[in-house]
């Protein structure tokens, strides 16, 4: 009997795409409204059903609720983003694999090539940016719904997760240490929990979101 995954491929894909956006650019006014929307609350409630994710989801929910108490929440979130992800001092958490690995950051390029993907010309960040890993994982989970390439895409998913887990824990630790208000700290902890949870799903059957 085939074991069903705790989350469907489409659900993983959507969550990874959402997280990629949050780690790639500052939250604007529209993004802040979305964070506080019923839609995001429903998504977080879905994730919270998984015991491995419950604590990190609850922490992020608390930080989202706390944004309502912060004056100029959007501007302050933008400042947090800048301080963590754009600065180069010791109190930052730069979102690039090459900041944490003692080797050339070429793995993501090979993974993208295997997936038949390329970085958009408009993307001005280095290719080893966290958002690229997350967009790749989103693409791979959507592709797992196509039975003719499921085995290849599942193998590539595992390689991508393993590559990401080589440096994501240290990135998360830096977010926790250096995020003064805790939103991005909570977000990074949720991301790490999801990636580890996904990494435990060794062989996905074909299943659609219900």
From Swiss-Prot:
Cystines in this chain: none
Signal peptide: none
InterPro entries reported in the protein's UniProt record: Chaperone_TorD, DMSO/NO3_reduct_chaperone, HscB_C_sf, TorD-like_sf, TorD/DmsD_chaperones
Subcellular location: Cytoplasm
Any single Pfam family the record assigns to this protein: Nitrate_red_del
GO biological process: protein complex oligomerization; protein folding
Main location: cytoplasm
Segments passing through the bilayer: none
Cellular-component GO terms for this entry: cytoplasm
Record key words, sorted: Chaperone, Cytoplasm
PANTHER family hit by this protein: CHAPERONE PROTEIN TORD, CHAPERONE PROTEIN YCDY
HAMAP family from the UniProt entry: TorD (MF_01150)
Family, as annotated: Belongs to the TorD/DmsD family. TorD subfamily.
Protein name per UniProt: Chaperone protein TorD
Organism: Salmonella arizonae (strain ATCC BAA-731 / CDC346-86 / RSK2980)
Taxonomic path: Bacteria, Pseudomonadati, Pseudomonadota, Gammaproteobacteria, Enterobacterales
